Design a protein with these regions (language model features):
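Short, well-ordered secondary-structure "scaffold" segments embedded in the functional core
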Residues: 1-177
Length: 177
Protein backbone atom coordinates (compact mmCIF):
# COMPACT_ATOMS: atom_id res chain seq x y z
CA UNK A 1 0.00 0.00 0.00
CA UNK A 2 2.81 2.49 0.71
CA UNK A 3 4.16 2.12 -2.85
CA UNK A 4 0.75 3.13 -4.21
CA UNK A 5 0.68 6.11 -1.85
CA UNK A 6 4.10 7.24 -3.01
CA UNK A 7 3.18 6.86 -6.68
CA UNK A 8 -0.06 8.76 -6.11
CA UNK A 9 1.77 11.52 -4.20
CA UNK A 10 4.38 11.91 -6.94
CA UNK A 11 1.64 12.05 -9.59
CA UNK A 12 -0.32 14.67 -7.65
CA UNK A 13 2.80 16.78 -7.15
CA UNK A 14 3.59 16.58 -10.88
CA UNK A 15 0.05 17.61 -11.84
CA UNK A 16 0.09 20.42 -9.30
CA UNK A 17 3.47 21.76 -10.47
CA UNK A 18 2.54 21.43 -14.14
CA UNK A 19 -0.99 22.82 -14.20
CA UNK A 20 -1.47 25.01 -11.10
CA UNK A 21 -0.42 28.24 -12.83
CA UNK A 22 -2.94 27.68 -15.63
CA UNK A 23 -5.85 26.40 -13.56
CA UNK A 24 -5.75 28.51 -10.41
CA UNK A 25 -4.43 31.94 -11.29
CA UNK A 26 -6.41 34.85 -9.98
CA UNK A 27 -4.88 37.18 -12.58
CA UNK A 28 -6.88 35.33 -15.28
CA UNK A 29 -9.87 37.19 -13.90
CA UNK A 30 -8.43 40.67 -14.56
CA UNK A 31 -11.04 41.42 -17.22
CA UNK A 32 -13.86 40.37 -14.88
CA UNK A 33 -12.46 41.83 -11.65
CA UNK A 34 -14.37 45.10 -11.74
CA UNK A 35 -17.60 43.27 -12.65
CA UNK A 36 -17.04 40.99 -9.64
CA UNK A 37 -16.48 44.01 -7.40
CA UNK A 38 -19.67 45.64 -8.72
CA UNK A 39 -21.70 42.47 -8.12
CA UNK A 40 -20.49 42.15 -4.52
CA UNK A 41 -20.98 45.88 -3.91
CA UNK A 42 -24.58 45.60 -5.14
CA UNK A 43 -25.24 42.90 -2.53
CA UNK A 44 -23.05 43.97 0.39
CA UNK A 45 -22.98 47.75 -0.02
CA UNK A 46 -20.08 49.41 1.86
CA UNK A 47 -17.21 47.68 0.07
CA UNK A 48 -16.50 48.61 -3.55
CA UNK A 49 -13.30 46.69 -4.31
CA UNK A 50 -14.03 43.13 -3.13
CA UNK A 51 -13.73 40.54 -5.91
CA UNK A 52 -14.18 37.28 -4.01
CA UNK A 53 -14.32 35.39 -0.76
CA UNK A 54 -11.45 33.56 0.91
CA UNK A 55 -11.60 30.71 3.39
CA UNK A 56 -9.66 27.73 4.63
CA UNK A 57 -10.84 24.20 5.28
CA UNK A 58 -9.49 21.23 7.18
CA UNK A 59 -9.55 17.70 5.79
CA UNK A 60 -8.94 14.87 8.23
CA UNK A 61 -6.47 12.11 7.42
CA UNK A 62 -5.15 9.01 9.11
CA UNK A 63 -2.61 9.49 11.85
CA UNK A 64 0.88 9.25 10.32
CA UNK A 65 3.60 7.10 11.84
CA UNK A 66 6.16 9.93 11.76
CA UNK A 67 5.89 13.66 12.45
CA UNK A 68 2.42 13.48 13.96
CA UNK A 69 2.76 16.93 15.52
CA UNK A 70 3.18 18.54 12.12
CA UNK A 71 -0.33 17.76 10.89
CA UNK A 72 -2.18 17.51 14.21
CA UNK A 73 -4.69 20.27 14.87
CA UNK A 74 -5.75 20.85 18.45
CA UNK A 75 -8.66 22.93 17.19
CA UNK A 76 -10.06 20.08 15.08
CA UNK A 77 -8.73 17.44 17.48
CA UNK A 78 -7.28 15.30 14.75
CA UNK A 79 -4.70 14.93 12.03
CA UNK A 80 -5.23 16.52 8.66
CA UNK A 81 -4.34 19.05 6.04
CA UNK A 82 -5.63 22.55 5.41
CA UNK A 83 -6.54 24.08 2.07
CA UNK A 84 -7.41 27.63 1.09
CA UNK A 85 -9.55 28.89 -1.76
CA UNK A 86 -10.95 32.08 -3.20
CA UNK A 87 -14.38 31.94 -4.82
CA UNK A 88 -15.50 34.69 -7.20
CA UNK A 89 -19.14 35.84 -7.55
CA UNK A 90 -19.55 33.70 -10.67
CA UNK A 91 -19.09 30.62 -8.45
CA UNK A 92 -15.68 29.63 -9.80
CA UNK A 93 -12.71 28.81 -7.60
CA UNK A 94 -10.24 31.40 -8.85
CA UNK A 95 -7.44 30.52 -6.44
CA UNK A 96 -6.69 27.34 -4.54
CA UNK A 97 -3.81 26.54 -2.21
CA UNK A 98 -2.67 23.62 -0.17
CA UNK A 99 -2.11 21.25 1.33
CA UNK A 100 -0.75 23.00 4.40
CA UNK A 101 0.07 21.44 7.76
CA UNK A 102 -3.10 20.95 9.78
CA UNK A 103 -1.85 23.00 12.70
CA UNK A 104 -1.39 26.16 10.62
CA UNK A 105 -3.80 29.07 10.89
CA UNK A 106 -5.69 30.53 7.93
CA UNK A 107 -3.61 33.71 8.09
CA UNK A 108 -0.45 31.61 7.68
CA UNK A 109 -1.92 29.90 4.62
CA UNK A 110 -2.63 33.32 3.12
CA UNK A 111 0.98 34.42 3.57
CA UNK A 112 2.43 31.09 2.37
CA UNK A 113 0.18 30.86 -0.69
CA UNK A 114 1.56 33.94 -2.42
CA UNK A 115 -1.98 35.21 -2.91
CA UNK A 116 -1.04 38.65 -1.61
CA UNK A 117 1.49 39.11 -4.43
CA UNK A 118 -1.01 37.84 -7.03
CA UNK A 119 -3.61 40.28 -5.67
CA UNK A 120 -1.03 43.08 -5.93
CA UNK A 121 -0.35 42.17 -9.58
CA UNK A 122 -4.08 41.96 -10.34
CA UNK A 123 -4.66 45.34 -8.70
CA UNK A 124 -1.92 46.86 -10.85
CA UNK A 125 -3.46 45.37 -14.02
CA UNK A 126 -6.88 46.76 -13.14
CA UNK A 127 -5.61 50.08 -11.80
CA UNK A 128 -7.50 49.79 -8.52
CA UNK A 129 -6.67 48.07 -5.23
CA UNK A 130 -8.81 44.94 -4.99
CA UNK A 131 -9.42 42.70 -2.01
CA UNK A 132 -11.01 39.44 -0.94
CA UNK A 133 -13.38 39.10 2.02
CA UNK A 134 -12.50 36.56 4.69
CA UNK A 135 -13.65 35.31 8.05
CA UNK A 136 -12.15 36.54 11.36
CA UNK A 137 -9.31 33.99 11.06
CA UNK A 138 -7.69 36.20 8.41
CA UNK A 139 -5.75 39.35 9.24
CA UNK A 140 -7.22 42.51 7.79
CA UNK A 141 -4.79 44.04 5.32
CA UNK A 142 -4.44 45.82 2.02
CA UNK A 143 -5.89 42.86 0.09
CA UNK A 144 -8.06 41.20 2.77
CA UNK A 145 -11.21 42.64 4.27
CA UNK A 146 -13.22 41.08 7.07
CA UNK A 147 -16.28 41.84 9.13
CA UNK A 148 -16.50 43.93 12.26
CA UNK A 149 -16.17 42.15 15.59
CA UNK A 150 -16.78 43.37 19.10
CA UNK A 151 -18.49 46.71 19.72
CA UNK A 152 -19.77 48.09 16.43
CA UNK A 153 -22.63 50.20 15.16
CA UNK A 154 -25.89 48.70 13.93
CA UNK A 155 -24.90 49.53 10.34
CA UNK A 156 -21.53 47.79 10.75
CA UNK A 157 -23.20 44.73 12.30
CA UNK A 158 -25.71 44.58 9.42
CA UNK A 159 -22.94 44.91 6.83
CA UNK A 160 -20.96 42.11 8.50
CA UNK A 161 -24.07 39.94 8.48
CA UNK A 162 -24.65 40.59 4.75
CA UNK A 163 -21.03 39.94 3.80
CA UNK A 164 -20.85 36.75 5.89
CA UNK A 165 -23.96 35.47 4.12
CA UNK A 166 -22.26 36.13 0.77
CA UNK A 167 -19.04 34.54 2.03
CA UNK A 168 -20.80 31.19 2.45
CA UNK A 169 -20.24 30.57 -1.26
CA UNK A 170 -16.57 29.84 -0.61
CA UNK A 171 -17.58 27.03 1.75
CA UNK A 172 -19.82 25.56 -0.95
CA UNK A 173 -16.77 25.54 -3.22
CA UNK A 174 -14.96 23.20 -0.84
CA UNK A 175 -17.69 20.62 -1.36
CA UNK A 176 -16.61 20.44 -5.00
CA UNK A 177 -12.96 19.78 -4.17
Amino acid sequence: PSAYSQIFSVLLQYLYDRFYPQVFDISRFATDALDFASAIHAKGQLIENCIGFIDGTFRHCCRPEDDQKVIYSGYYKGHGFKFQSVVCPNGLLCDFGGPHCGRRADSHMFRASGLEERMRQLSQKVGKILCVYGDPAYCRGEFVSKGYIGACTAAQARWTELMNALRETVEWGFMLV
